[in-house]
UniProtKB/Swiss-Prot annotation:
Disulfide bonding pattern of the chain: C18-C41, C27-C46, C31-C48
Keyword field contains DNA-binding: no
GO cellular component: extracellular region
Start and end residues of each LCN-type CS-alpha/beta domain: 3-58
Domain notes: Has the structural arrangement of an alpha-helix connected to antiparallel beta-sheets by disulfide bonds (CS-alpha/beta).
Major localization listed first in the record, in broad terms: secreted
GO molecular function: sodium channel inhibitor activity; toxin activity
Keyword annotations of the record: Disulfide bond, Ion channel impairing toxin, Neurotoxin, Secreted, Toxin, Voltage-gated sodium channel impairing toxin
The name this protein goes by in its record: Altitoxin
Origin: domain of life: Eukaryota
Organism annotation: Parabuthus transvaalicus (Transvaal thick-tailed scorpion)
Length: 58
């Protein structure tokens, strides 16, 4: 089953890039900014678990 989540966007509407795949402290910080507790680096972009559409942009 797919885990619900989203790629968060910065204030300019861009995805957050990341270099270290998997557990990534920068992505964790980004996801917390967007109001969710967990995220990681997937395909070189931060992805946040259980991030609702309404919280994708900050």
């Amino acid at each position: 089953a797919d885990v619900p989540g989203n790629y968060p966007l910065d204030k300019d509407g861009n995805t957050y890039t990341c270099l270290e795949l998997g557990e990534n402290k920068d992505c964790q910080k980004v996801c917390k900014l967007h109001g969710v507790q967990y995220g990681y680096c997937y395909a070189f972009f931060c992805w946040c678990k259980e991030l609702d559409d309404k919280d994708v942009s900050v």
